[in-house]
A protein has these predicted regions:
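Metal-cofactor-binding active-site regions of metalloenzymes
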Residues: 2-533
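Acidic/glycine-enriched connector segments
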Residues: 534-629
């Protein structure tokens, strides 16, 4: 039996599980695990990952040095980086100039400070190479900011914040204040891996190299492929939201077409792309305005860029806080596009990532089925995560499994990200074995190797050691990924031929720009409402009742289950109710105020009843959902 080399270890995913409970129950056999995989069982795809989550923190740092990217003063302050006296003096001088640009701004206080600091930069290469005395400490802090917590709990908000730190590098802008990057300076970088990568990047940029004129994005793709090559991965599908943006998408596609043949020649790794559609608008970027009709624009751009053989599908992404059936009109239009114009185009929906919307897995399949006209063939589709759904042992669950089998849909599992984002704390009922046993096609993804500090081998080891997949079950997963690999090869050849016919000798940018404008213009005439939603903005409906929280008192927050999933009921414990009464009795209403959830039941009701019983005069505030019915 041939094995891929490994060792005995406590995986980071286990450390995360330990951090989530005081009552850790996994035995030694699942805690201290053997880190090898039988070669015949090794999976060779990553079919669920994201563009700005692939590269390791060290690789992003190396790219920041090579491309001399701007690094904001805000992050220097935020993670407490150390500058030389000369660097500090210069950046403060630069800040004064930026401050003058905002002297008439409507912003004030911390918001104005943040705005100024966000737009005051140091050359990242300068920060590291001309500050070697602080490089080891600074690199350690920067590295920590670029990956999700490994040994502790995290939530979706942590994920969004890490993405912001990564955007400085992944979407970086070169500094105007370039420095000379000397080999002796590179040799002083205290981290060997970063040092090696910077040297290779400099070598790649030599005039005789085929990568001499690589853009930042092209370098990212090159290093993503090199990393996958080390992992034994041969086919990857990456979700990228830039592929749904007007003009930007065409620019990205030009870079992809130029670099990918070179990358495949060197690494034998084939990378293809899914156009990412946000299920809700992105709000974490303060200055990024999302068009009210962004879904319409996304669809029109996808229909433009999907002419390219490198665009193999679409992906509904983002935090799963809404019912997927709200997006039925969008799904319908994509399905009709796939069926009528782009046979083989894959529709992926993130569903079942957390337990708040367990019906989304089944509803996602129904949305696709309901999009078909009589006689039309089911398009290729995959579900990302699929962790939570109806009880698979129930009649409804059996119907779901049968529906997956009949439609040929596939489910992608990412164990590490589910544990890291606190969406999974118990492995006993993980559904993958049930799906495989019942003939549902299952695949593996990483959700972003660099983001979670893992690779595809780590992910497969987790399925082996923690979920207990057998060689026979891995063989079935290999059969599913082989189906994807074979389809991707045939699809690329067919689509590449059609793309050349579409271009008809024209420049790619010109041809796609014309088509983009035609599609956008046609889209303006389409009056179909793309989001079905009966929910109302709580901020508007409750505007008469909304008040700012007191600044002169201390909040006491009592979370009693208001935001539980629908099927979870809060049962009031008598001892806990007595403790709450004692707490409320001892609190001084002149110094504190109470904060509870919006449902006047469970412990929230106990709080209100106790305050009334004790005749206390507390200010009580309730957090409410953003949307209400």
């Amino acid at each position: 039996m041939e094995k891929l080399p490994g060792r005995v270890q406590i995986p980071a995913i286990i450390k995360t599980l330990m951090s989530q409970t005081k009552d850790y129950k996994l035995g030694i056999e699942k805690t201290l695990v053997s880190a090898y995989i039988q070669k015949k069982s090794k999976l060779r795809t990553d079919l669920h990952t994201h563009m700005n989550a692939n590269l390791s923190p060290d690789c992003l740092i190396a790219l920041g040095i090579k491309h001399q990217l701007r690094y904001p003063l805000y992050y220097i302050k935020k993670i407490n980086l150390k500058l030389t006296k000369k660097q500090e003096e210069r950046i403060l001088e630069d800040r004064k100039l930026i401050e003058k640009q905002y002297e008439n701004s409507e912003l004030a206080g911390k918001y104005l400070t943040r705005k100024i600091d966000d737009n005051t930069f140091i050359n990242f290469a300068d920060l590291i190479l001309n500050n070697i005395e602080n490089a080891e400490e600074n690199i350690a802090k920067i590295r920590s900011s670029l990956a999700i917590l490994k040994d502790g709990q995290a939530v979706f908000t942590n994920l969004e914040k890490v993405y912001l730190y990564r955007y400085v590098f992944a979407k970086g802008v070169p500094s105007e204040n370039k420095i000379e990057i000397k080999e002796e300076k590179i040799n002083q970088i205290p981290e060997t891996d970063i040092q090696k990568m910077v040297k290779q990047m400099i070598k790649d940029s030599e005039i005789t190299s085929i990568y001499a004129h690589n853009s930042l994005r092209q370098d990212k793709l090159l290093w993503i492929a090199r990393e996958y090559q080390k992992q034994g991965v041969e086919y990857v599908e990456i979700t990228d939201t830039d592929l749904t943006k007007k003009d930007k998408g065409i620019e990205v596609l030009e870079e992809i077409h130029e670099i990918m043949p070179k990358i495949e020649e060197e690494t034998n790794v084939r990378i293809r792309f899914l156009a990412g559609i946000r299920r809700i608008p992105l709000t974490i970027l303060r200055d990024q305005k999302t068009s009210h009709n962004y879904l319409r624009e996304n669809l029109d751009i996808i229909k433009t860029l999907a002419k390219s053989p490198y665009i193999v599908g679409s992906d509904f992404i983002g935090e799963e806080i809404n019912d997927i059936s709200e997006l039925q009109p969008v799904i319908t239009e994509l399905v009709q596009y796939a069926v009528n114009e782009d046979e083989g185009f894959t529709i992926r929906i993130h569903a079942g990532e957390n337990d708040s919307l367990r019906n989304n897995v089944g509803k996602s399949i129904d949305c696709i089925i309901n999009s078909l006209k009589p006689g039309q063939k089911m398009p290729r589709f995959r579900l990302g995560h699929g962790l939570y759904s109806v009880d698979l042992a129930s009649e409804e669950g059996k119907e779901l499994i049968e529906k997956m089998r009949q439609t040929g849909g596939m489910i992608e599992f990412q164990l590490t990200s589910n544990v890291r984002l606190n969406n999974l704390s118990k492995l006993d009922n993980h559904p993958i074995k049930t799906y495989i046993r019942n003939g549902v096609k299952c695949l593996q993804g990483t959700d972003g190797c660099g983001f979670y500090g893992i690779d595809s081998i780590d992910e497969q080891l987790a399925l082996l050691n923690l979920v207990g997949l057998t060689n026979e079950e891995f063989e079935k997963m290999k059969q599913a990924e082989e189906e994807v690999i074979l389809h991707s090869k045939e699809y690329f050849v067919k689509k590449n031929k059609k793309f050349e016919e579409f271009l008809a000798g024209r420049n790619m940018k010109d041809a796609l720009t014309i088509l983009q404008e035609e599609n956008l213009e046609q889209g303006k005439k389409n009056n179909v409402v793309l989001r079905i939603n009966d929910d109302l903005e709580a901020e508007i409906v409750l505007q008469e009742k909304i008040k700012p929280l007191p600044l002169d008192k201390f909040p006491v927050i009592i979370a009693g289950g208001s935001f539980n999933a629908q099927e979870i009921t809060t049962h009031v414990n008598k001892q806990m109710a007595q403790k709450l009464e004692k707490l409320i009795e001892e609190l001084d209403e002149t110094k504190v105020y109470l904060v509870i959830g919006h449902k006047m039941q469970g412990y929230e009701k106990i709080v209100l009843d106790t305050v009334k019983k004790l005749n206390k005069n507390f200010e009580i505030y309730a957090f409410v959902p953003k949307l209400i019915t």
